[in-house]
């Protein structure tokens, strides 16, 4: 099974080498990478640096979409394969990440991994490990974004709310199955400009209320 790995790129090109290196070091090598450049012209330093990595397995595509969710949805359309992984440009994977997820793909629709922060923090976020009891989705976002492996047909990010959490709610509603490999295989960088510090958590109550109404709880 081949995997399409999506790296949306707006800021953080200085971290791209580490992300790409962590993909190249995977024990599972049946993959392609799409680096989706958004908001940078062809004469920009970001575009030039990304082009340095282009080869038969790594594609560079420009998008004129506004915002990460719309860019990701376009990247999914351009993906060659039926399995999608997401890697934020400032994050990276341990070498057996894809191999261990692929071994579970026939059993589960959404597969994540345990994660560790690095950079300005080094703790391990608390998420459900092993087979995820999706009843707990109202308490915690069950999948770390950069750890996810998901079917292409299920991949759609909504820019109205917190994009990944909203998608997990939708897939739980559709009775999809979730699993987190109980091993730290994803490293999530925390730094002043990271999504961790800048995501709009004010949307969270509205998101929870939206899905409580749909679930009838």
Feature locations, PLM:
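Cell-envelope/extracellular polymer assembly enzymes that use nucleotide-activated donors
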Residues: 2-4, 22, 32, 166
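A conserved hydrophobic helix/loop-capping motif in glycosyltransferases and polysaccharide synthases
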Residues: 3-15, 19, 26, 36
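Acidic donor-binding segment of Leloir-type glycosyltransferases
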Residues: 20-62
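Glycine-rich, basic loop-to-helix element that forms the pyrophosphate-binding segment
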Residues: 46, 63-79
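Short aromatic/hydrophobic "clamp" motif used to bind/position activated sugar donors
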Residues: 84
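The conserved acidic donor/metal-binding loop of glycosyltransferases
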Residues: 88-92
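Conserved donor NDP-sugar-binding/catalytic core segment of glycosyltransferases
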Residues: 98-124
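Conserved nucleotide-sugar donor-binding catalytic segment
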Residues: 132-203
């Amino acid at each position: 099974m081949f995997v399409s790995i999506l790296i949306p790129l707006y800021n953080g090109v200085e971290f791209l080498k580490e992300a790409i290196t962590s993909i190249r070091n995977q024990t599972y090598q049946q993959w392609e990478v799409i680096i989706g450049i958004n908001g940078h012209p062809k004469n920009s330093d970001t575009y030039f640096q990304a082009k340095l990595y282009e080869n038969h397995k790594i594609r560079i595509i420009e998008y004129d979409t506004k915002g990460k969710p719309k860019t990701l949805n376009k990247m999914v359309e351009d993906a060659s394969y039926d399995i999608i992984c997401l890697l934020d440009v400032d994050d990276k994977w341990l070498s057996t990440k894809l191999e261990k997820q692929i071994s579970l793909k026939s059993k589960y629709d959404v597969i994540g991994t345990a994660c560790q922060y690095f950079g300005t923090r080094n703790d391990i976020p608390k998420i459900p490990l092993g087979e995820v009891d999706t009843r707990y989705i109202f308490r915690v976002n069950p999948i770390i974004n950069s750890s996810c492996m998901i079917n292409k047909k299920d991949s759609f990010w909504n820019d109205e709310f917190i994009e990944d959490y909203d998608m997990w709610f939708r897939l739980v509603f559709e009775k999809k199955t979730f699993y987190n490999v109980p091993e730290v295989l994803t490293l999530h960088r925390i730094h002043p400009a990271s999504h961790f510090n800048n995501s709009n958590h004010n949307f969270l109550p509205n998101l929870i209320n939206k899905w409580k109404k749909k679930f009838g709880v």
